[in-house]
Amino acid sequence: MKSRIPTLLFVLAISFSTTGFSQDDDATSKSNLQTYTPSKLLNRGQWDINWFHNLSTEPKFADGNGKSISKARENYFTSTVEAFTGISDNNRFNIGVIVEMRSNTNNDRKALSVFEFDGDKNTARSGITSFAPTIKFQPFKNIGNFSIQTAFHIPLVKNETENGVYLDQTAWTLQNRFFYDYSFENKDWQLFAELNTEYNFGDDTSFANNTFVFSPGIFLSYFPNSDFTILGLAQHSQRFGDFTQDYTALGFGAKYQISNILNLETIYTNFVRGTDNGLGQTFNIGLRALF
């Protein structure tokens, strides 16, 4: 799939807070799942590290008319590390970095072939493909459940495709993500929304060059207890500019707080439709450390 969006969206640590939870509230009475949402920023000196794995396998392709066509299976694995720390006394500004490693295979190889790293130059490629210095901030002092994350993705890939095997885009990316969460009155059901926007530029040979991405997503979560949550999600992504494509994905997942520091997350998604985009499934698992 020639798209950065599936990985970046599902890297999201999908945990939710209570309505109107401010940056200065005492979080000790709640689990990290409930307190530290993507909208919530860190205290000074606090660290949030996410290690997330995304496997996308595509046996079909949606053409320019949205018609689903069978193809030789393609597989895309992305391992992403995100590290953030708080640097402000008012809990409104964080800095961080995002690093991505990819392993892709094609030519109808099995989905798990991405873990073989066999170096078959005609069907496989792998490597560290990008890193992104990142800032995250709370623009409105009195709205603690809304934040913005800005990342500048710097490609480390020289050629997007070699011997017919795609690895990652060579265009640079300026990305802005807007996070908002809301908790219903009974506090068992919570809603999270994200709007992801991108501008891709800097390499005329890249499929993504001079394109914009607009990608909203919504997640509904239920908490049987404070240490466990199940969720459903819906996402749409639209790319426009010199190259156009779009897709819609639906999915579900769960998250469990293993300890005061560690959270475990798993998500499944299915690309139910698209235009000029691969169709298939993603399997995601992640580990988050907060200290």
Descriptions of predicted regions:
Residues Q23-N200, T211-L290:
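Transmembrane beta-barrel domains of Gram-negative outer membranes and organellar outer membranes
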